[in-house]
Amino acid sequence: MKKKAVSILMTAAMAASMLATTAMAGETEASTEAFDPGTGKVYLLNFKPETDEALQTLASDYSSQYGVDVTVLTAADGQYNTTLTSEMAKSDAPTIFTVGNATAAQTWNDYTYDLKDTPLYSHLTDKSLTVNYDGKVAAIANCFESYGIIYNKTILNDYFQMDNAKAKSMDDINSFDTLKAVADDIQSRVDEINDKFGTSLTEAFASAGLDDSSSWRFSGHLANLPLYYEFKDDGVDLTAGEPTIKGTYLDNFKNVWDMYVSDSAADPKTLNSGSYNAEQEFGMGEAVFYQNGDWEFSALTNEDNGYEVKAEDLGMMPIYFGVDDANEGLCSGTENFWAINAKAPQEDIDSSLAFLNWVITSDEGRKAMVDDMGLTCPFDTFTGDYASKNAFGAEATALQSAGKTSVAWSFNATPNVDDWRKDVVNALTDYTSNGGSWDAVKTAFVDGWAHQWTLAHEGEASTEAATEAATEAE
């Protein structure tokens, strides 16, 4: 089939400009125009499990206030594409769904409503935060995120005071080699640190779980680093990628992964058991380092969770990869783009657009997005009391201001993302838990990419046909 031009218009540097634009618009108020919720139904298929509770509450409040039926279904980790395909085949299909990358924009082209002339688009502070395909704005980002290695400032500052510490301040931890030296040393001195400072430390790094609830941190977010640096070398679009990869930086991936595993109290043989909770380990002060993103800020600082860490304890550093550590910033981007189902009845389209506009303009919606979900939102309505309170997002901006280069979310290019990641996780599990060969990880990463790319980019017509057939058969 003839390929159409696809672009996810996003650059790593836009985080700073987006946040700066929002800050300068401090006096911007939410729209005061008369609100019309419409007469249709809203069905949001949510991509982010960690936002489910807040979205369910919003849906209930909106339904009570406006009499509009709002349903929120949250897909399980790693199952979004499967769930989306299944739900889209039903007569009551989602009216709002997530388009995460170029492949998704192509696959669901017939289902994406052009958002260019909507209030949602008009409120977007950075018009590059869209997925554009086939001459239309197919989807709009609902948040902008950064991830790296979360660290406990208080415990690290205690460690820096110890004799023979491998670093004396955070400024010293500016490369993979130094990070590994510090992590190795902390892991070997856990009891000494606890005795000296009264901490409850058990490990340097929180567990690197390979079950579905955690493995995406490594098959997606850690895997982003070798993809990013290879795409950069090859001079291709950093978020659109290329049909084949060489795995140039997989040895760097291995070095970081081995550090995560060896400098943790978790048993490597049981990492896929689902028995570990890395957030809890870090939140209770049992770990110094935890690879995750700014979406964790809300959970870690929520008093209801009973964690010992406080907001002032938290910092985030880049995932130093041993390639360009001196210039590397956090990994910044998004894969969370709202799309509207163009095949839904017009009244449902109108009500779905009204609901999203309410989320980004109402007090209830903005509070939920910022306070309950901990998101940094790219709309001009998120100012004043609704400006992001996420300290991790501020770290991303500070690093950019210091001249560091944010790492683009190159994993947005991943073809058939769930299938590719599953194969990588299986190989990574065999290597880590069963003494398998690292070559199998390379094969899953490199050969698996080419295979899934072929399926994704040449099989779009069959995917769409299958969905249409399922719909007609219902």
Q: Residue ranges of each PLM-predicted region?
A:
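Conserved N-terminal structural module of periplasmic/extracytoplasmic solute-binding proteins
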Residues: 7, 20-104, 120, 347, ...
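Hinge/lid segment of periplasmic solute-binding proteins
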Residues: 29-34, 99-157, 195-200, 313-320, ...
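Extracytoplasmic "Venus flytrap"/periplasmic binding protein-like
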Residues: 61-126, 130-132, 136-139, 154-168, ...
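Short helix-initiation/N-cap motifs at beta->coil->alpha
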Residues: 74-83, 174-178, 270-284
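Extracytoplasmic/periplasmic substrate-recognition and gating elements
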Residues: 90, 305-374
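Extracytoplasmic/periplasmic solute-binding protein
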Residues: 136-142, 147, 177-241, 287
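Glycine-centered hinge/linker elements that transmit conformational signals in sensory
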Residues: 183-184, 233-272
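C-terminal capping/gating helix-and-loop segments adjacent to ligand/active sites or protein-protein/ligand interfaces
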Residues: 332, 372-375, 381, 396-452
